[in-house]
């Protein structure tokens, strides 16, 4: 069993499902609102490891969907500066277990890292609202 520090956007359906899967797998989850953290470039950077910069950005963020932010055009410092100012741009969830940190919820990677139960909950990485105009009920206009 792992103690998972889990940064989410409350009301996000996938974050809710991801936490439920972690708990069902025997892990303890300490959830925090990603928007309420005092992020800096230095505190954010370790969560992204060697992932390409474009994968650091939440593709369902309103500014990405509107074309205002183009993840593939950003370098590391630009991406970090944008995410520090607008936490909705951060790919969720951010998770930490001990000194190991990661972003997103690739089920196979999380299973290899801390272990998950065998049930298949379906796609819990891609925002189900991304292909529609649906907004999460928790906060209109926020992804």
From Swiss-Prot:
Gene3D superfamilies: Glutaredoxin
Annotated catalytic residues: 12
NCBIfam families from the UniProt entry: nitro_assoc (TIGR01616)
The family this protein is said to belong to: Belongs to the ArsC family.
Protein name as catalogued: Uncharacterized 15.7 kDa protein in draG 3'region
Species the sequence originates in: Rhodospirillum rubrum
């Amino acid at each position: 069993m792992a103690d998972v520090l889990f940064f989410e956007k409350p009301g996000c359906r996938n974050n809710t499902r991801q936490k439920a899967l972690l708990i069902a797998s025997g892990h303890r989850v300490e959830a925090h609102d990603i928007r309420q953290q005092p992020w800096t470039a230095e505190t954010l950077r370790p969560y992204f490891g060697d992932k390409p910069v474009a994968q650091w950005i939440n593709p369902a963020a309103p500014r990405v969907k509107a074309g205002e932010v183009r993840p593939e055009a950003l370098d590391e410092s630009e991406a970090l500066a944008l995410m520090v100012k607008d936490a909705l741009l951060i790919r969720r969830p951010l998770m930490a277990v001990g000194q190991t940190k990661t972003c997103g919820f690739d089920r196979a990677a999380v299973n290899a890292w801390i272990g998950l139960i065998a049930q298949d909950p379906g796609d819990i990485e891609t925002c189900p609202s991304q292909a529609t105009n649906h907004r999460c009920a928790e906060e209109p206009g926020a992804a």
